[in-house]
Amino acid sequence: MIPNRKIQLSLFAVIIVFETLLNQVYAMELDEATRTVTLEESGKTITLTPEQVKRGKRLFNNSCAQCHNGGITKTNPNIGLDPESLSGATPVRDNIRNLIEYIKDPTSYDGATSIAELHPSIKSAEIFPKMRNLTDEDLFAIAGHILIQPKIAAEKWGGGKIYY
């Protein structure tokens, strides 16, 4: 039984190393154009570093993907994280600054009602513990991840259950 255990542990270690290398390659492969996203409503842009890209992916997967895997919204399939949905919201959520504000204190799609008690956020960190330790830098990386995904996954990002 012990040799099998060693084989299992070795295989697990190889998978972890492969996953780590794959994530590093993923972030490095993205050119500047892909890593450039809108910073604020004025249209000002910013180019994310490979480290921010990698960090955003990890944090999104840990804190957001349970409900937003692939850019969908499991609780409301009509509103996803695709560019069209983000730009149609009030205020628009198609830039880093506004996405950060939304993650801190989410509102309904029309911006009229707080949904902090229903949607994980910094404001509702007591209810949603995964949000508890996220810093502004973490939120910046998560917002960046959301905004570069349409450039990487194209129509699959926010495309709904036909893809996921």
Swiss-Prot record:
Locations listed in the record: Plastid, Chloroplast thylakoid membrane
Gene3D superfamilies: Cytochrome c-like domain (1.10.760.10)
Keyword Signal recorded: yes
Essential cofactor(s): heme c
InterPro entries the UniProt entry points to: Cyt_c-like_dom (IPR009056), Cyt_c-like_dom_sf (IPR036909), Cytochrom_C550 (IPR029490), PsbV_cyt_c550 (IPR017851), PsbV_cyt_c550-like (IPR016003)
Keyword Ribosomal protein tagged: no
GO biological process, one term: respiratory electron transport chain
Membrane topology designation: Peripheral membrane protein
Chain sites annotated for binding heme c: 64, 67-68, 131
GO molecular function, one term: heme binding
Summary of subunit composition and partner proteins: PSII is composed of 1 copy each of membrane proteins PsbA, PsbB, PsbC, PsbD, PsbE, PsbF, PsbH, PsbI, PsbJ, PsbK, PsbL, PsbM, PsbT, PsbY, PsbZ, Psb30/Ycf12, at least 3 peripheral proteins of the oxygen-evolving complex and a large number of cofactors. It forms dimeric complexes. The extrinsic subunits in red algae are PsbO (OEC33), PsbQ', cytochrome c-550 and PsbU.
Protein name listed in UniProt: Photosystem II extrinsic protein V
Gene source species: Gracilaria tenuistipitata var. liui (Red alga)
